[in-house]
Swiss-Prot record:
Source lineage: Bacteria, Pseudomonadati, Verrucomicrobiota, Opitutia, Puniceicoccales
EC number: 4.2.-.-
Protein family: Belongs to the radical SAM superfamily. Viperin family.
SMART domains xref list: Elp3 (SM00729)
Annotated source species: Coraliomargarita akajimensis (strain DSM 45221 / IAM 15411 / JCM 23193 / KCTC 12865 / 04OKA010-24)
Protein name: S-adenosylmethionine-dependent nucleotide dehydratase
Binding site for [4Fe-4S] cluster: C17, C21, C24
Entries under CDD domains matching the protein: Radical_SAM (cd01335)
Catalytic activity: GTP + AH2 + S-adenosyl-L-methionine = 3'-deoxy-3',4'-didehydro-GTP + 5'-deoxyadenosine + L-methionine + A + H2O + H(+)
Length: 310
């Protein structure tokens, strides 16, 4: 029997992003709202929290985008989700993280996921993983990770494996960063989102496997490595668009449910295809353990420390 809703939802609160990653599939081209109204966002959170007994408790909400930190109310929204008893998670490119914001998120944000597709400035520029300034450096990533962890926020990393970063070796960085999990996605094609020039980024299954195997040794450092093929990503995520609708990506496109605030979260979710077995198989349920510091994460002479902008 299909669950009422998945135990984790990806709540895409905003379309805008300060980066321009060319293979991004979260542009929501058919979405008629740029930023989710806060009243709708909080209503969706309330409905989601009310169903946690049907899936897993505490249920988890991933705040995503676009770049969710561009929303002027993202800290307030995370705090509201936390007040409902939800596990809170933020997926960000990390460029807007500051000590001031991390101070506000301390005790409210359970999991910080930073998307890092390359450690090479030239590759990041070619991908579009930059804004008007230079891409983040290795030392800047490590500084953000350390400052989050010392505030009691667990850190996870995401990487999209594609044609440009396929031969990169990130082992030393991951060992130093010590995320609780490192998720590796094979670059995913979504029709009408990133399909126009997808061949420029696409890789073969065996190339993805080689990238994963090259990095298996990070597991000996206590990092959980989680690879996801395209097949594992289709139909296994509870995705909510900025206009408050579930998205069905099971057929390689985005098909939208009715608005949750109009029909209710259970009825809206019934309109999309979701595989709970697939969700579990890809490791969708896992423990988040906070740590205040990690001796493996030290800023070395090779990567001189840079302070965050307050």
């Amino acid at each position: 029997m299909k669950p009422a809703i998945p135990p984790t939802i990806n709540l895409h609160t905003i379309r805008a992003c300060n980066y321009g990653c060319k293979y991004c599939f979260a542009g929501f081209q058919d979405c008629d709202t740029g930023v989710m109204p806060q009243a709708d966002l909080h209503e969706i959170l309330r409905q989601f929290a009310a169903t946690t007994g049907m899936a897993i408790h505490p249920a988890k909400v991933n705040f995503a985008g676009g770049e969710p930190m561009l929303s002027p109310t993202f800290v307030e929204d995370i705090c509201y989700a936390k007040s409902l008893g939800l596990t809170t998670s933020l997926v960000t490119n990390g460029s807007l993280l500051s000590e001031r914001l991390l101070d506000k998120l301390s005790g409210q944000l359970d999991l910080l996921t930073i998307s890092i597709d390359s450690l090479k400035p030239g590759t990041n520029r070619a991908i579009g993983r930059t804004n008007r300034q230079n891409p983040l450096t290795v030392s800047e990533y490590l500084d953000r990770i350390l400052k989050a962890r010392t505030r009691g926020i667990t850190v996870k990393l995401n990487t999209v494996v594609n044609r440009l970063n396929l031969d990169e070796d990130m082992t030393d960085f991951i060992r130093e960063a010590q995320p609780i999990r490192w998720k590796l996605f094979k670059v995913l094609k979504i029709q009408n989102e990133n399909s126009a020039h997808f061949d420029s980024w696409a890789i073969r299954d065996e190339e993805f496997v080689h990238f994963v195997e090259r990095h298996r040794k990070v597991e000996s450092s206590g990092v959980t490595l989680v690879p996801e093929s395209n097949e594992q990503m289709y139909g296994t995520y509870g995705i909510i668009s900025p206009d408050g609708r579930f998205i069905d990506n099971s057929q390689g496109t985005h098909r939208y449910s009715p608005r949750i605030v109009d029909v209710g979260i259970t009825q809206a979710f019934a309109d999309v295809n979701f595989s709970m077995a697939g969700f579990q198989q890809r490791g969708g349920i896992y423990s988040i353990k906070r740590s205040t510091t990690n001796r493996s994460l030290q800023t070395s002479a090779l990567h001189p420390k840079r302070e965050l902008t307050k």
